[in-house]
Design a protein with these regions (language model features):
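Metallo-beta-lactamase
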Residues: 31, 55-56, 63-66, 117, 123-199, ...
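N-terminal pre-domain segments of enzymes
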Residues: 1-26
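Active-site metal-binding motif and surrounding structural segment of the metallo-beta-lactamase
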Residues: 54-55, 65-117
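Conserved beta-strand hairpin/beta-sheet module of binuclear metal-dependent hydrolase folds
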Residues: 22-82, 206-211, 215-222
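Short, conserved active-site loop motifs that form the nucleotide-linked donor/cofactor pocket
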Residues: 36, 114, 193
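Catalytic metal-binding/acid-base residues of hydrolase active sites
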Residues: 93-95, 122, 223
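Structured segments of extracytoplasmic/periplasmic soluble domains
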Residues: 77-81, 103-106, 125-140, 226
Length: 228
């Protein structure tokens, strides 16, 4: 569907958006650093897998269950089968939590086998934005992203942070641990993570985190290479 990208930008497309589309179309499993992996290009957002002592810490499980399940299958095929020990929602936009039930179940959480971690105020804003305003937002998105257009030199290209919104089933599981203070630290499956709350930034409820043992800083969508 995107073979037309194998050329320089035509006169019908903004060159920056054309290049952004070429880069977003590079998809698959990527090693970020030792023990941290991402599946990119499977949905509007990327999903991150952090290896703990016994299993995975999954960060932002995409928008739809089908995409999240496919991403997890790719990880297992290439990196082995390990249980999910925790899910972290970086912020309250649906493309960062909607696929959660494609990776874990409510039973996993209720049994205490899996933690679900989110910033303070996450559930309130996830509900207010995605339920109360969801229909209106969806209609506006069709104009913003050109979702009714075919992908072509004269049609739809990428949407800045990804190739587009997936059209599968969205889901939700409530957090079991809410981060309420910047500097708060938690050790999850042997990995110490320090959190920084960033409310009212790219989303009403959002947070960054730091993994000192990996020298890795996660900034969610507070830092993107687009005008998103």
């Amino acid at each position: 569907a995107y073979a037309f990208l194998d050329q320089d930008a035509p006169d019908t497309a903004n060159p920056s958006l054309w290049r952004d589309t070429q880069l977003n179309h590079i998809y698959g499993l990527f090693e970020v650093t030792d023990g941290i992996y991402q599946v990119r290009g499977y949905d509007m957002s990327n999903v991150t897998f952090i290896k703990g002592d016994t299993g995975w810490i999954v960060v932002d499980p995409l928008m739809s269950m089908e995409c999240a399940a496919a991403a997890f299958s790719l990880v297992e095929e290439n990196l082995g089968t390990f249980p999910v020990k925790a899910v972290i929602y970086s912020h309250s936009h649906v493309d960062h939590f909607g696929g959660v039930r494609g990776i874990i179940s409510e039973e996993d959480v209720q049994s205490g086998d899996v933690q679900v971690i989110a910033p303070e105020g996450f559930e309130k804003h996830a509900v207010s934005e995605n339920i109360y305003a969801g229909t209106a937002m969806g209609r506006r998105a069709s104009y913003q992203y050109g979702t009714m257009l075919e992908a072509s030199e004269t049609g739809a290209l990428a949407i800045g942070i990804g190739m587009g919104q997936s059209r599968g089933s969205t889901s939700y599981i409530s957090p079991t641990l809410e981060i309420t203070e910047t500097g708060e630290k938690h050790t999850i499956d042997g990995v110490e993570i320090e959190f920084q709350l960033t409310p009212g930034t790219e989303a009403p409820a959002e947070m960054n985190f730091w993994i000192g043992s990996k020298n890795a800083l996660w900034m969610a969508e507070n830092c993107t290479g687009t005008l998103h």
